Amino acid sequence: MDDNKAKALAAALSQIEKQFGKGSIMRMGDGTIERDIQTVSTGSLGLDIALGLGGLPRGRVVEIYGPESSGKTTLTLQVIAEMQKLGGTAAFIDAEHALDVGYAEKLGVNIQDLLISQPDTGEQALEIADMLVRSGGVEIVVIDSVAALTPKAEIEGEMGDQLPGLQARLMSQALRKLTANIKRTNTLVIFINQIRMKIGVMFGSPETTTGGNALKFYASVRLDIRRTGAIKKGDEVVGSETRCKVVKNKVAPPFKEAHFDILYGEGISREGEIIDLGVQHKIVDKSGAWYAYKGEKIGQGKDNSREFLRANPALAREIENKVRAQVGLNAMAVEAAPAGVAPVEP
């Protein structure tokens, strides 16, 4: 660059910093821009791997959507629990007025420190979210759900009034305001969303999410979560087999999938995932119904093997660390495994 251009650029940069503040424009090579994206675990090892970075990115917008009873709120509560373990403050904006506090506590959420709001209108919910983000005092804000963010005009109107595009405009305006503050304060904002059917679609999927297209554009990560089957103990259904697909990912390669079990009253079965991923990466051996690690039997059947790992958390961490090492994620702290524990049999 010649001297005249360099002087003109330096003057422009100086004027920008004077008008908009220091740091409003930076040179990438100066090292002032953070390259490494901070993440928080989802509570599911398989999903952390599928996301590519080991969890959901902080300072970004995330959308989690799926059919009813697919595990959307369960997944977000697990993320809140993981953030609280790191010492972060979490806020839950319950627009559906349906949060089960007892269930959240079972999933490991510290209810005493959880900030909760049950707003009357969509505008109120999004304004509260914006104020929390701008404060810089919270690490994660969850909005449950976009479909329940009812505009004030709709609440004050009559029961059959046609108000097309009102919610979409509300979401578009809110996200325009939120995104810069989310990045500046490094806050993770999760929107839970529901699925609707488009009428008259002949080709392609008729499914769509509520709240217009703005969230699809602003979200750095979009997760599609589905229930694929039931987990039974005898005739009793004790959980759901779940598939979670990374539909959009701006921070790592997208379109990866994770399969995990959600046990009722417990949440995502981490031990079940460790067994499945251990077998997949040839760390755990499977012979018939038996599972073995380093030649030692863990248990017969997945349920018994899961119970064995639950009783031996240090061994579970050791297997998890080997899986993490193979996929390039950071290891967990390993403790010495207790000796002389027999494998679990039926």
Swiss-Prot record:
One of its GO terms (cellular component) is cytosol. Keywords: ATP-binding, Cytoplasm, DNA damage, DNA recombination, DNA repair, DNA-binding, Nucleotide-binding, SOS response. GO terms for molecular function: ATP binding; ATP hydrolysis activity; ATP-dependent DNA damage sensor activity; damaged DNA binding; single-stranded DNA binding. The keyword DNA repair applies. One of its GO terms (biological process) is SOS response. ATP binds at G66, P67, E68, S69, S70, G71, K72, T73. The keyword rRNA-binding does not apply. CDD domains: RecA. It is found in: Cytoplasm. It comes from the Bacteria. Pfam families: RecA, RecA_C. Its main location: cytoplasm. Can catalyze the hydrolysis of ATP in the presence of single-stranded DNA, the ATP-dependent uptake of single-stranded DNA by duplex DNA, and the ATP-dependent hybridization of homologous single-stranded DNAs. It interacts with LexA causing its activation and leading to its autocatalytic cleavage. Belongs to the RecA family. This is Protein RecA. The lineage of its organism: Bacteria, Pseudomonadati, Pseudomonadota, Betaproteobacteria, Rhodocyclales.
